Amino acid sequence: MDVISDKIDASLQLALQLPTEELEKSGSLSAGYEKESQSWELILRLAGSVQTLRQAFPQASFQELSGGYVTALVPEDAIEALAAQDSVIYIEQPKRIVTGVAQGVRASCIWPLQQEMTPVGPLSGRGIFVAIIDSGIDYFHPDFRNADGSSRIAWLFADGKEYSKAQIDQALAAEDRTSALSLVPVTDPSGHGTHVAGIAAGNGRASGGRNRGVAYESPLIVVKLGTARSGGFPLTTQLMEAVEYVKRKSIEERKPVAINISFGNNYGSHTGTSLLETYLSQVANQWKMAIAIGTGNEGQEALHQQGRLSAFRQELGIELAVDVYETSVNLQFWKRYQDVVDLVLLAPDQSQVFRFLDSEQGVGEGQIASYVWNNTEIHVFFDAPSPYQIYQEIYFAFLPRTDYVDAGVWTIRLLPRRIKDGSYALWLQTGGSLNENTGFLQASEETTLTVPSTADKVISVGAYDSRRNQYASFSGRGFAWVTGEVKPDLVAPGVDITSCAPGGGYVTRSGTSMATPFVTGSAALIMQWGILEGNDSYAYGEKLKAYLLRGALPLLGEPMPSERTGWGEDVIIRLH
């Protein structure tokens, strides 16, 4: 591309300027790139008809979502022309998302509600969809089958194909597992989705009811993320398509739905303003639904640093340790656009790699600069605010010239020149893609929650240890950067949670991935009580969240609200 468009996000603009061999060194920068066809998966915000784009770009494919959001697969050489279309408001690169990995039921006060009788029986999630958007599911597991052996899964979507309950029942009736998988070829090798589904809605049949989930009679919608095209890594484009699929199925069947998302990443300003976050916030208001999202497990990972610059301080040094054998490091620096700050990058030997002179006239914005130090190439993109982002991002990509990035302590010096607010924040990519000792030497504990749990209209869920009744130290913390919005909204049990495992048994895991489905199941119970049983026809969306927050109780020693635990632990409201 000869011209860089203000409509394209920073990581994509940098990625489009790198040679393919450089691009492939970074899993973050290459997310969404299809080498064989030289095409990119993209997220678009559109004002107008997607049909116009289909006619103008017949070599591309577009999938229309709600509210003017579109996912697309576009040849690289057509992206600049696409961005030039008046109807295209903004384009974002998809990001890789990672998982956040019987006691919990009782700790959340859900057990009494499951026993409490209503005019039509106990609260069990009956008549409310629970949607699991995850790594798949072991649909053979007894906990996802009825007493007659039929499936509790109403719809299963994987690898671009949809399977109905009737098709799953046909597979379950096959003479052996191989024959069944030839009919419905869906598995869950990691077991993550199976475990999450069991917490939210497993019926406990394999344990005689002992390991029963929350909404144990809810019908399930399951969407498996990750495709061969994305190398098996789930992308934010696929997450958005999955949410859209679930919403449309729920509307078709006129059933409320509680959606579980136990995935996240670190890319973004953590202010709820990316296309993924704004999409989730607007779709949450389109139907009788609740969306619960885990805050991730970055609470102790040293992947974030934030602070406030002073006009009276000459400079601030931020030290970043890079471990040995690191194949790539990606760093975002965010600040308010009205603050003028020069940046200096020092190599591990304290030699100056580059100095960026910020300009009050915006000189240098939209530009890419590349530098070399020993075995490391440093590519830097200086972005400007976007139609959806009032903050300024400077994106760093540390890539090896041969095998690994140079280990040692790199230093970013911030030299304030004109400060109106002074807030700044830095994030590294999600911890699962970095070695153990890579991180900031003076890391910040606050605002370590992952995107998209930062979206405004979702229920953001952290984790606590229900045995000790204390915050789980790994759980991603709030509040939202700069805005101060209270996130997480609340916490749920996330330490040593026993739930379903592929093969028919159970396994114990920890993480916000395990906490989130407790809240998803709770949401299904509230919707059953309110919508199906006539107690509150509007018990969904923000009103449902309000019910959960009203019923939340503080953990011992935690203020309310707390950056660690939000408004407290998920103690589902007293319905009678």
Regions found by a protein language model. Give the residues of each.
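Mature extracellular/periplasmic domains of secretome proteins
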Residues: 118-125, 145-147, 211-215, 233-258, ...
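Extracellular S/T/G-rich loop segment that most often corresponds to the catalytic His/Ser-adjacent loop
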Residues: 157-174, 301-402, 414-415, 439-524
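Edge beta-strands of jelly-roll/beta-sandwich modules across compartments, strongly enriched
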Residues: 420-431
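Active-site glycine-centered loops adjacent to acidic/histidine catalytic or metal-binding residues
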Residues: 134, 296, 511
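Hydrolase catalytic cores
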Residues: 197-200, 221-229, 245-258, 340-342, ...
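Subtilisin-like serine protease catalytic core
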Residues: 117-237, 254, 326-329, 338-339, ...
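C-terminal subdomain of the subtilisin-like protease fold in secreted/lumenal serine endopeptidases
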Residues: 32, 252, 256-265, 283, ...
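Autoinhibitory N-terminal propeptides
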Residues: 1-120, 128-129, 142, 562
